[in-house]
Amino acid sequence: MSSEKSGLPDSVPHTSPPPYNAPQPPAEPPIPPPQTAPSSHHHHHHHYHQSGTATLPRLGAGGLASAAASAQRGPSSSATLPRPPHHAPPGPAAGAPPPGCATLPRMPPDPYLQETRFEGPLPPPPPAAAAPPPPAPAPTAQAPGFVVPTHAGAVGTLPLGGYVAPGYPLQLQPCTAYVPVYPVGTPYAGGTPGGPGVTSTLPPPPQGPGLALLEPRRPPHDYMPIAVLTTICCFWPTGIIAIFKAVQVRTALARGDLVSAEIASREARNFSFISLAVGIAAMVLCTILTVVIIIAAQHHENYWDP
């Protein structure tokens, strides 16, 4: 490369054999560069790289010698190609950042935050945390005439206007009302129009469809009287069984066995009715037989008379 750069100029004849001394065809006029080209080929390429053009050596009929001669002649034997548009340094555009600065992408704006201010004085802070009150005991059955409180204990007062700040427990005034509890049908002493202390009786409430008051369970009947009557007057074998079942009913009631008492009561009733039915049937049959015998006796007497 250094030998090519330091070769003889075109005015000195070449001593080497052809084709070095062959005449060269006329070269195309080069595009004038924006600045004066440097003397060396290395600086020539460096300049055109900076100015946006590239210089390519033109190959003629002389092969490598033509290329060397063209390199010595410089711009007269080279073709200049324009630099692509994307390699050209862009000029400063309107609103563009200065060179050497990086542009960050625009982020979406922050969501809108609404800050509400409450006018007026804030409610006082709640009192110090205290242990919660124990749960109220479950209501139990009480004797007639006792009262049952509807609220257990005092729980505070409600502030004026009925406004309760959020986050504060609701406080109510202690209730002093008591509801008297009386069984249905029991007399109680109350303030009636007749005067204080007058005893009155609550009427039973009206019963709707499907509503019934629970009444105490009645003990089963022993059917002892009808068992004795049927034993004496009607049919004594079944009557004795009915009396025995009636005694079992009383024994079961004495020990509190209602189921056995009900079973024995039904059996005593059935045997008593059997004794009654057998006794009635026997009376009817005896009456019929008596009538038949009387009629037959009269007919026999008439037959034997002269």
Swiss-Prot record:
InterPro entries: CD225/Dispanin, CD225/Dispanin_fam. Residues 245-275, 297-306 are extracellular. The chain crosses the membrane at residues 224-244. It is found in: Cell membrane; Synapse. Residues 1-223 are cytoplasmic. This is Proline-rich transmembrane protein 1. The keyword Lyase does not apply. Residues 40-49 have a biased composition (Basic residues). Disruption phenotype: Decreased Gria1/GluA1 and Gria2/GluA2 density at extrasynaptic sites and increased density of Gria1 at synapses. Reduced cell surface expression of Gria1 and Gria2. Reduced phosphorylation of Gria1 'Ser-863' and increased phosphorylation of Gria1 'Ser-849'. Reduced synaptic transmission in immature hippocampal neurons. No change in basal synaptic transmission in mature hippocampal neurons. Shown to impair tetanus-induced long-term potentiation (LTP) in 8-12 week old mice in one study. Another study shows no effect on LTP in young mature mice at postnatal days 24-36. Residues 276-296 dip into the membrane without crossing it. It is a single-pass type II membrane protein. Its main location: membrane. Belongs to the CD225/Dispanin family. Required to maintain a pool of extrasynaptic AMPA-regulated glutamate receptors (AMPAR) which is necessary for synapse development and function. Regulates AMPAR function and synaptic transmission during development but is dispensable at mature hippocampal synapses. Plays a role in regulating basal phosphorylation levels of glutamate receptor GRIA1 and promotes GRIA1 and GRIA2 cell surface expression. Component of the outer core of AMPAR complex. AMPAR complex consists of an inner core made of 4 pore-forming GluA/GRIA proteins (GRIA1, GRIA2, GRIA3 and GRIA4) and 4 major auxiliary subunits arranged in a twofold symmetry. One of the two pairs of distinct binding sites is occupied either by CNIH2, CNIH3 or CACNG2, CACNG3. The other harbors CACNG2, CACNG3, CACNG4, CACNG8 or GSG1L. This inner core of AMPAR complex is complemented by outer core constituents binding directly to the GluA/GRIA proteins at sites distinct from the interaction sites of the inner core constituents. It comes from Mus musculus. GO terms for biological process: learning or memory; long-term synaptic depression; long-term synaptic potentiation; protein localization; protein localization to cell surface; protein phosphorylation; regulation of AMPA receptor activity; synapse organization. Residues 15-36, 87-111, 121-138 have a biased composition (Pro residues).
